[in-house]
Amino acid sequence: MAEIVFQGASALALDAKGRLAVPARHRDVLGALAQGRLTLTKHPVGCLLVFPRPAWEGFRDKVAALPLRAEGWKRIFLGNAMDVEIDASSRVLVSPELRQAAGLVKDVMLLGMGSHFELWDVQRYQAHEAEVMQQGLPESLGDFSF
């Protein structure tokens, strides 16, 4: 079976209870791949990481195996992880703690990042993207052909 790759951006809105409607193009894959089970946690750049449960388990195991000097990062990734399920209306509840950590209020952007997603506040994402673009290409992409 080919590796599942999530890609693309979806502009979405959180409802008053902090729920996010999963885009239709991802629902079937997430249902088949993870039975609608996801894990959300903090990302160091100020967004949230959203993993289908099988991808989370691999990530979690890598983080748990980090040396003691990375204990703080273990706390950030594992200590803030929340298991959620896609409900019958195709929504996911983002906890108040994680919404606050990522500055999520209403308008959000869900970005497919391969095996997982990033969930951003729209304005925070636009500022982050502008900053990245202003920095230019990193040296590691010097030989990359577009």
Swiss-Prot record:
Keywords for this protein: Cytoplasm, DNA-binding, Repeat, Transcription, Transcription regulation
Ranges where the SpoVT-AbrB domain occurs: 9-55, 81-124
UniProt-listed GO biological process terms: negative regulation of DNA-templated transcription initiation
GO MF, one example: transcription cis-regulatory region binding
InterPro entries: MraZ, MraZ_C, MraZ_dom, MraZ_N, MraZ_sf, SpoVT-AbrB_dom, SpoVT-AbrB_sf
GO cellular component terms given for this protein: cytoplasm; nucleoid
Transmembrane domains' residue ranges: none
Subcellular locations according to the entry: Cytoplasm, Nucleoid
PANTHER family according to UniProt: TRANSCRIPTIONAL REGULATOR MRAZ
Family: Belongs to the MraZ family.
Quaternary structure, from the entry: Forms oligomers.
Name of the protein in its database record: Transcriptional regulator MraZ
Gene name for this UniProt entry: mraZ
